């Protein structure tokens, strides 16, 4: 049963540079259909949450370049609740702004924070875990979802739970410590230990609770945000444009979670979470032929294996190549070693250095 004071905050300000050349400033990863499912990633995120949080209680923070496209894709989310941040200031100011807004709209607001561009393979199980986190937030706790690690990943932060924590129970336990992204050797130790979980970037709290946390641990930003008028005030947008860029550029993890003493976590079993962080991740999610090729285009392949192809309506012929990413758009083509998928963002940096703004 959905509660009327449950809200969802979707963070949708990322650029998705590792998905170049599909992901661009005005068509970032979160508004793309990457071939997994029938809708775009942000549409899927909103649809997934609907049994607990209907669209009218969804709020989205994004950037000025992609806001209009998000409004177009999500007609059931009130347009005034899709807000473009005036500057990039990481997750602590963004969440603080959302908490200020929600507390002015509903003093009893409890909200979950969700990335806009992740895949969830088992939505039903996911919602059960989300409900458990919301129940903890009702008790003025800060709740996080920890995902049971499936391999020793070095690209995620980890959450340390008490030894003996059992995954999959729909209850929360105190979080011992947040760990930074580890080296491979340490990541292997985390997985073997059995009580370290991936930090999936999903958090739950009362608006009042996280505002208290910001006042205690990030007072400069909290003071700036508290100077804003209530949401809906005629000067609200102008004041946000002036105040928000002055906030500290820091994540909510560093600003509050690592310092707070009221953080609990749900030690989640496998609900099919995937942050879809690169073209390689898409390759892993899609069906593959007998030679391990995955393609969104018509494919002719000979003596070729392990390739990912996304070239629209074109027929793509592969001959004697392996483990490539091939992505074709009207003005750019990416050909990359699939093992270097995490480095595709470096191409965007190179284009920025060359001032090829039309390509980013």
Regions found by a protein language model. Give the residues of each.
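Short coil/turn connectors at secondary-structure junctions
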Residues: 3-7, 55-56, 78-79, 106-109, ...
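Conserved N-terminal catalytic core of the sugar/cofactor nucleotidyltransferase
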Residues: 1-10, 18-25, 35-127, 131, ...
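Residue-level signal for inorganic ion chemistry
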Residues: 42, 98, 117, 159, ...
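Short beta-strand segments
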Residues: 10-12, 61, 112-115, 144-148, ...
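Conserved core of the sugar-phosphate nucleotidyltransferase
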Residues: 123-244, 264, 338
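Left-handed beta-helix
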Residues: 2-5, 207-360
